[in-house]
């Protein structure tokens, strides 16, 4: 990804075409699914390149949503966007307070125990329903033989601090798990 694209945040994905007038199904990754339409323009990844496109209209359809993108007036024109990712520039996202952060900020951060043991780096975050879970890829020569750790994201109980500047998360966690 070029440095110009590093500030992009994927907020959804386009699905199959809907009808004959160029509408597409929309799958939102935003917390409130409809808020994906508050961001303009969308950047759509087609053949490896991000292209800006405006939303002409959108509506709920059954359990999901569909959108009409500017310049797509027939089904055949819209088909090229089937399964394409939808991104926006990171600076379009709402500002957060000092204690809040976006999950994307955690990726790549080092995870260290309160005793100073380096557990590895965050590679993914799982949503489990009760609480989110950090997926931490262990260092190659992990003293405990771990390749990956799943650490529950329980603020104060497990997660002791997050330092954006140092790119570090301090946890109260047994390195043997």
Swiss-Prot record:
One GO biological-process annotation of the entry reads:
rRNA processing
Q: Do you know which Pfam families this protein is assigned to?
A: PRC, RimM
Keyword Cytoplasm (UniProt): yes
Where does it sit, as one GO cellular component term?
ribosome
Taxonomically, the superkingdom here is Bacteria
Q: Note the coiled coil stretches, chain numbering.
A: none
Q: Which InterPro entries match?
A: PRC-brl_dom (IPR027275), PRC_barrel-like_sf (IPR011033), RimM (IPR011961), RimM_N (IPR002676), RimM_N_sf (IPR036976), Transl_B-barrel_sf (IPR009000)
Summarize the protein's role. An accessory protein needed during the final step in the assembly of 30S ribosomal subunit, possibly for assembly of the head region. Essential for efficient processing of 16S rRNA. May be needed both before and after RbfA during the maturation of 16S rRNA. It has affinity for free ribosomal 30S subunits but not for 70S ribosomes.
Q: What assembly does the database describe for this protein?
A: Binds ribosomal protein uS19.
> What family is it from?
Belongs to the RimM family.
* Record remark on domains: The PRC barrel domain binds ribosomal protein uS19.
Its recorded name reads Ribosome maturation factor RimM
Q: Which organism is it from?
A: Photobacterium profundum (strain SS9)
